[in-house]
Every structure is written in C-alpha cells, then in structure tokens.
Amino acid sequence: MEMSYTKIDLNEWSRGKLFKSYIENMRIVMSLTVEIDVTNLIEFSKRNNLKFYPSMIWIVSKVVNTHDEFKYSWNDTGDLIKWNFISPSYTEFHKEDENFTKLVTEFSDDIFEFSKRFMVDKEKHEADRAFCGKPAFELF
C-alpha cells in the first residue's frame, strides 16, 4: 500500500488558526449513530454476488473519502497532513472462540476491487487474534 499525503502549512491554510484553537484548547471527540435503510445495498450485493459486510464497509469508506475533512492527520514528525485516501479498519468476529481480529483493507474506489481485497485480508488473517494491517494513522 502506498502511503501518500500532502503536508499542510498551518500558517498558509485558510483554516489554520481555527484548527490550532481546537487542537490546543478543546477535547475533540466525535461519535455518530444513525439509522440507515440498507435495502438497496443488500439487493445490490446479492445481485453482484458480493457479501454484505464488505459492501457496507466500502460504502461508508467511499463517503468518508469524499470529504477532505476526514483525511487530516499527523505524520511521524508531527506535521499536519491530508491523506490522498484513507482505508477502513474493521472487526472480524470469530464465533468459535468469541475473539476478534481488527483488520485494515486498502481502500479502492471500485467496490468489486475492494471486496476482493477484503476477502484476501480476511482469509490471510483467519487464524489471527490481533490488530493486523496498516499503522493506525492512515485509517478510520
């Protein structure tokens, strides 16, 4: 996976002063719960022989990646950056032992490509009970 981003100059960025105020003076937490009708996604997944879970992960990832505001982070030297894209982290639950694996699959704009990557990652880490994949800074 190629990790590519653009470095942000806080002094030149139009939102730089506001960003500094929030980061320096406020505790920032975001949580969101909404009801969403997934009927069309279920039908699409069935018609295209896709599993629902990776389809759901993909569609949320697609929306997140259309908003630059969700792609800001810090690089390893502490610079503010904006990722070109971010990849989802998700949990794969193991019924047999009630454990889980936390996985990351590289995002693709194409649902079919993402679904293939998802299944490869799932199979590759089937026996793992850990956090697997990319470092936490380029994912959500």
Name each model-derived stretch.
Residues 32, 88-90, 139:
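A broad, low-specificity signal marking well-ordered, structured residues that form hydrophobic/aromatic
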Residues 65-69, 127:
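A generic secondary-structure boundary signal that marks alpha-helix termini
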Residues 94-140:
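Helical lid/core segments from catalytic subdomains that handle acyl or acyl-like groups
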Residues 28-30, 50, 54, 86:
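Residues at beta-strand starts and edge strands
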Residues 59, 71, 130-133:
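Histidine-dependent nucleotide/RNA phosphoesterase domain, centered on the 2H-phosphoesterase fold
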Residues 70-104:
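Small-residue-rich loop/turn and linker elements
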Residues 41-66:
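Acyl activation and transfer enzymes in specialized metabolism, enriched
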Residues 1-46:
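Flexible, P/S/T/G-rich "lid" or insertion loops adjacent to the active sites of thioester-utilizing
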